Amino acid sequence: MSGRARVKARGIARSPSATEVGRIQASPLPRSVDLSNNEASSSNGFLGTSRISTNDKYGISSGDAGSTFMERGVKNKQDFMDLSICTREKLAHVRNCKTGSSGIPVKLVTNLFNLDFPQDWQLYQYHVTYIPDLASRRLRIALLYSHSELSNKAKAFDGAILFLSQKLEEKVTELSSETQRGETIKMTITLKRELPSSSPVCIQVFNIIFRKILKKLSMYQIGRNFYNPSEPMEIPQHKLSLWPGFAISVSYFERKLLFSADVSYKVLRNETVLEFMTALCQRTGLSCFTQTCEKQLIGLIVLTRYNNRTYSIDDIDWSVKPTHTFQKRDGTEITYVDYYKQQYDITVSDLNQPMLVSLLKKKRNDNSEAQLAHLIPELCFLTGLTDQATSDFQLMKAVAEKTRLSPSGRQQRLARLVDNIQRNTNARFELETWGLHFGSQISLTGRIVPSEKILMQDHICQPVSAADWSKDIRTCKILNAQSLNTWLILCSDRTEYVAESFLNCLRRVAGSMGFNVDYPKIIKVQENPAAFVRAIQQYVDPDVQLVMCILPSNQKTYYDSIKKYLSSDCPVPSQCVLARTLNKQGMMMSIATKIAMQMTCKLGGELWAVEIPLKSLMVVGIDVCKDALSKDVMVVGCVASVNPRITRWFSRCILQRTMTDVADCLKVFMTGALNKWYKYNHDLPARIIVYRAGVGDGQLKTLIEYEVPQLLSSVAESSSNTSSRLSVIVVRKKCMPRFFTEMNRTVQNPPLGTVVDSEATRNEWYDFYLISQVACRGTVSPTYYNVIYDDNGLKPDHMQRLTFKLCHLYYNWPGIVSVPAPCQYAHKLTFLVAQSIHKEPSLELANHLFYL
């Protein structure tokens, strides 16, 4: 099937004149309209080209990708859907006060800055109509902005909706303009709404304003963030470039309008798509090249450095070459080769390369068909890192060394950004035109909750480092361990010696932990994935408790085929270890300890506990991600504790296709988890606290309207008597605010256990931040918690302290993790299924942490 046919098959309609090979009506570059206060005549701030005259000479815009007011400044409109959700007013116990009081107070500085504006500031929303109607959004904007009534006003316009910070004299204003063709266009501007500064629409406008401001600082928007290509950091040994930049946001925090910014980096490969395709062809051969190439490239994001724009590769058109022609807006035809020579003085060297196809998002209020951009692989640079690259330790170390910032370094970068905005004449003018001014950087008071004691079988340890008790795990007996009597080790001839050496170390380490490990049956296999699976099929019987595979390489097919068979087809706990990992003799004790911990858990063992004051409490972790092979399939991982000590778990993973289906499967899971709890405890839990991770922007409403009712329904149906009390907490590891302590005129990471529940939180939500990890180098990130439903009525102090306790119970690491253990377990489960298994694991493994 040709690229043209595939595009049609995927529902991307071509224009009528695009049926001939090489003739497409769509431009190679997207159209653009900037939301500046003089879009019709000025440059976009970083390309130096006129929107109307210069670009129209070629019939092609070289400016910003044409997204609308609602889309362009706010890359995803869903970002602001959550702002209209108010959950706190329904929670009586925190309606008046949601802050805790226990713990040691600590002064913190943040990456949040006050934005000052007049008390009577309002935003005026108008609707603009044109008679006769105009299809061109750019022409609509140009005609409207040519009038003196709007020339000196701060404004944002998407072709239909106009926002002004100053009210027009009349509710209905009528204007007229004449086009270059002499046609008279009548425009009617009608006032629709007067919006207070707290309106979600105003928040969108504020964010668009600051995105315009960063463009005035010669920064480029890629995705949601802005980057500075003039200050690249090179990693030549790995052919990578890093563009420094910022993620920014404007929002209300506890009734204050605040500007937040954090440092960001864009990873760019110094490798063109053509170079990638050439290398791939050499590896795979011509027979399966096109299929492999499409599989690896479609869906990736590329950067065209001649205009610093990013595009998604939606297809590859093998029938179109750079020597083919396309039709410009003025009706003339030009070859791609000649176009790039004329427009950018770029000479295309390979005239036989295929063309990449990118679907340009259809503009809001634009009635034209969705357009396709044809891009030349030779001029497109790959962005991001491949899975192979992320597994390259040396590469990731080199990237980390460039991007890791100390708290003081991060603070300096943020201070410089704010200073640049205030010093830049155009940026400052943009702010002042809208009536905005930068205020002070926010300082606040947090609290440090007490550290936890780790409960072992015959020992209570207070770790020297509160975040790590790895030394204690080697010398103390774990809570409970099942003996490993019948098990298999699969290895090749080449790795047999290292297997024997490792086995001796493993048995010594496990013995000191109280985990009895007998000698296994060692089976030698050939070094290919199919041989491992055949050996498993041959030797695994009902008595085998665990299968260990020592893999000769990190080739993904080894791990995937073994895990898929032993998780679904023949459910037996499995342990995969790379042979090269076992060759690190100086680290053998540490490696053996970690593997012994994992094996214990996979057999149903319990490693340690913390004191849980609440009796009869079930905690649940839920995570959702997309399947790596089928992007329309969502993998839902659910993990629930089944004993009061919160050391035993019930895990299940379900594959679904819609968010409604996700809500439905949560009821199925909760029913199974409650049955399991009843089986072990002969009663239902008095309290259930659900930690919901994997929540995207704009999904709070779905959680509240669909998921919470399903959870409540399963709880209510489980007992005819009194039902368990339920709380649901949304967990987000990625959040904009950062916190620092000031010591000796410098800033440092806050202490472990720091809680922030004021000033940087939302007034309409019951929320808090918790720092439950230690950053030896770099800057620590807080985790954000939003309690969206709460029947338990716990005091904020108790909810925060319980959450901190749960961060100690992740058995894959003898230390504290950044999220509660059930969340991390659910993440590990979904990752295994989404990346390797691609089907639901057998319920026979549900009582074990088989995915560690």
UniProtKB/Swiss-Prot annotation:
Polar residues bias: start-end ranges: 34-48
Pfam families: PAZ, Piwi, Piwi_N
Location in or out of the cell: Nucleus; Cytoplasm
Stimuli inducing this protein: Up-regulated in vitreous aspirates of patients with proliferative diabetic retinopathies (at protein level). Up-regulated after exposure to oxidative stress and VEGF in adult retinal pigment epithelial cell line (ARPE19 cells). Up-regulated in cervical cancer tissues.
PTM notes: Arginine methylation by PRMT5 is required for the interaction with Tudor domain-containing protein (TDRD1, TDRKH/TDRD2 and TDRD9) and subsequent localization to the meiotic nuage, also named P granule.
Matching InterPro entries: PAZ_dom, PAZ_dom_sf, Piwi, RNaseH-like_sf, RNaseH_sf
One GO cellular component term: P granule
Sequence segments annotated as region (Disordered): 1-48
Basic residues: bias regions: 1-11
Sequence ranges assigned to domain Piwi in this UniProt record: 546-838
Tissue expression per record: Ubiquitously expressed. Detected in retina, retinal pigment epithelia cells (RPE) (at protein level).
PAZ domain: residues covered: 272-384
Keyword Zinc applies: no
Protein family per UniProt: Belongs to the argonaute family. Piwi subfamily.
Function of the molecule: Plays a central role during spermatogenesis by repressing transposable elements and preventing their mobilization, which is essential for the germline integrity. Acts via the piRNA metabolic process, which mediates the repression of transposable elements during meiosis by forming complexes composed of piRNAs and Piwi proteins. The PIWIL4-piRNA pathway acts in the nucleus and mediates silencing of active transposons: engages with nascent transposable element transcripts and governs the piRNA-directed DNA methylation and subsequent repression of transposons.
Protein name in the entry: Piwi-like protein 4
Protein species of origin: Homo sapiens (Human)
Taxonomic classification: Eukaryota, Metazoa, Chordata, Craniata, Vertebrata
Underlying gene: PIWIL4
